């Protein structure tokens, strides 16, 4: 993990949910009970690389909401 950068995870309306450090891991829980762990890398205030894919944090939140996937720090 690098120099103290934190990724502020929000919902699709930009409400803060939690933060994870650069290199931190989130747990995604699917509706069928399966879970998945993803590494998060800080890009800038509004963007992160999650499981190797670059997202605007709000876009990621919208996709998770649309697919009914909950997520939290691991």
Residue ranges: model-predicted function:
Residues 53-74:
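Intrinsically disordered, low-complexity, charged/polar segments
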Residues 1-19:
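Mixed-charge, Lys/Arg-rich low-complexity intrinsically disordered regions
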Residues 12-13, 31-33, 52:
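Glycine-centered tight beta-turn/hairpin loop motif at sheet-sheet or coil-to-beta transitions
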Residues 8, 25-27, 47:
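Residue-level detector of beta-strand face positions
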Residues 46-53:
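Short, solvent-exposed secondary-structure boundary/capping segments
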Residues 18-31:
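Short coil-to-beta transition motif at edge beta-strands of beta-rich domains
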Residues 35-44:
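Short beta-strand-centered aromatic/proline hotspots
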């Amino acid at each position: 993990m690098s120099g103290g950068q934190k990724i502020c995870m929000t919902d699709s309306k930009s409400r803060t949910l939690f933060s994870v450090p650069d290199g931190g891991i989130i747990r995604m829980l699917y509706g069928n009970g399966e879970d998945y762990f993803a590494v998060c890398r800080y890009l800038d205030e509004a963007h992160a690389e999650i499981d190797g894919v670059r997202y605007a944090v709000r876009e990621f939140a919208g996709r998770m909401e649309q697919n009914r996937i909950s997520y939290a720090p691991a």
